[in-house]
Structures are given as C-alpha cells and as structure tokens.
Amino acid sequence: LYSSVKDALQQFPLQIHFQMNIILAKPRGFCAGVTRAIETVEKALAKFGPPIYVRHEIVHNKFVVESLRKKGAIFVDEVDQIPVGAITIFSAHGVSDRVEEDSLARGLDVIDATCPLVSKVHREAKKYEEENYEIILIGHKGHPEVEGTSGRVKKDVILVTDENDARTVEIKHPEKIAYVTQTTLSVDDTKKIVEILEKRFPQIQLGLATKDICYATQNRQDAVRSLSKMVDILLVIGAKNSSNSNRLRDLGEECGLPSYLINGGSNVDPRWFENIKTIGLTAGASAPEVLVQDVVNKIKEISKSEVVVSDMDGITENTFFALPKKVRK
C-alpha cells in the first residue's frame, strides 16, 4: 500500500497554491483640482514656453513636481524669487491677499491654479468677515491652504487644529462666530471638533460640519473605510507633506489595519506582508496612477506567490474644473 501511494504522489505531485490579493481602492488618486493644477502648468509650458514659475509645489507630490521641473517649470517658495514680469502660477492650495499684492507689485503675469473648492472657502471666509463674524479656521498649522485662507481676511483668524484646541480656544464675541475648514481634513475628526465648538458656543454659525471638506477627500476616506473590511494591511501612496494622504493612512490605522504611507514601489518593505493574504492599496489626491502601478509591480516582484489585482466596487467621480482662461485654447 505504501509503495502504491508513493508511486501515485510521484506521478501527481502535491501542489500547494498560495495567492496574494491586492484590492485597489475606488476612487483613488488625482482629484479634479489636482488634475486642473497640473494641466495648467503643462498648458502654460506648451503655450508660452519655459521657464514657467510656480509658487510652492503645484501639488504635494515629488514625482509630479519633478516631472514638471524637467519640462521647464521652476518652483519657488516666494514671489520675490521670481523675475519681474515672469509668468507665474499659484499652486492648487491657494494664496493670501498679500501674495497676490506682491505679485502685482512685481508685475508678474499670474495664472491662478487654486482649486475652485479652496477658492470657495476663501469667499466664505470673506463673507463672514463682511458680516462681522469672528472666524475660526479648522486646519493644520503651516499648511499652505491654511495660510492662504487665513490671509484672505483682514481680521485675525483663530486656528483650531484639534479637539483640545476646540475645548480651550478663547472667543471674544461668542455671540457671533463662524467657522471654515481646510478642504483636506479627516471627516470624522472635523465632525468631533465642530461638535465641541457647538456645545461651547451654541450661537456659532452652523452648517454641515464637513461643508468645506472637498468631495474627493470624503470619497477617498469612505473608500478606505469600505476597503478596510476586506484587507489585512493598507498602503497609501502619497507624500509626507500631503494632508489628505496622511489622513488616509491615519484612517487605516483607526480601522485596525497596519497602514503605511509610501512614495512608490521603492518604499515597499517585504516584511510587511508576512502572513498577509490581502493588501489594500489607495492613493492620495495628489498621487498619479503610474505610482499605483509601480507599487503593484514591486509587490509582484517580491512576492513568493501569485498576485491577483482587483478594483473594489466604488463610485466613479465625474467632477471637472475648467482651466484658467489664460491657458485655454
């Protein structure tokens, strides 16, 4: 009997089949505002020729910035680094009134690539100022978008960064206050902050707590929540200075997953995948799809098993923003 079983096994060797799954979040990657900003630089380069100056990174992604730099874009920190009269593009994050005034004083030919949803927050803040509200800005200190929004009103804006700030912030006129937010915040964190403010200041001008958080930020966070139920680990493609990418990584951790923020395939560590069957992969709003494929290829390269890639069910985004007039055909 033993010899017959042995012969059978030799004739039909036992094959143990392992499979690793990668589930791609949907939606992921570029949002309409990022697409518009990048296309603005590319169209300006094509229409006017290099160099084209850009104040700050056009979007928070080194891969995108380097690709545009190779085409002739020059990125600077402040407008006083730009030659008088040069073509200048403002980044998707928006700028303050002071930056606009300094640009005008230097005679710069400005093309504004500010995301329209950020511009909407600017208008909202100005409206509150005109109506004599004390303004709270919920956001991250030092973020370009926060600096731009706070610099759009002449009175001091009160920055609230977290729940502790919301509990301790002092308001001179609690009978007339309003709030605006950065567009790339955590939806859940923002709701908690607004709830605290509402309890402390019942007369605060209220709207939907997440009224200023952009559609793409909400959609990508919702996708990660759904994805977290299907995977053992989460990889988020995005830059360290990308607010929305960091929030996706944080959300993955809150959902109980080992979660890593990476720039691309070169950051993938094989040790992350020990005893892992299913990998969740998403990308922040400034990360191009080519980096998603780069990470997938890296996982396939280091995997000792077959890798099957699929997209999760999710919404299809159809939002589109027209380009600035100066770069339209």
Q: Where do the PLM segments sit?
A:
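The feature marks the mature, well-folded catalytic cores of soluble enzymes
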Residues: F18-A283, E289-K329
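Acidic, Ala/Val/Gly-enriched low-complexity intrinsically disordered segments
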Residues: V5-A8
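Cationic, low-complexity basic patches in intrinsically disordered or flexible, solvent-exposed regions
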Residues: Q11-F12
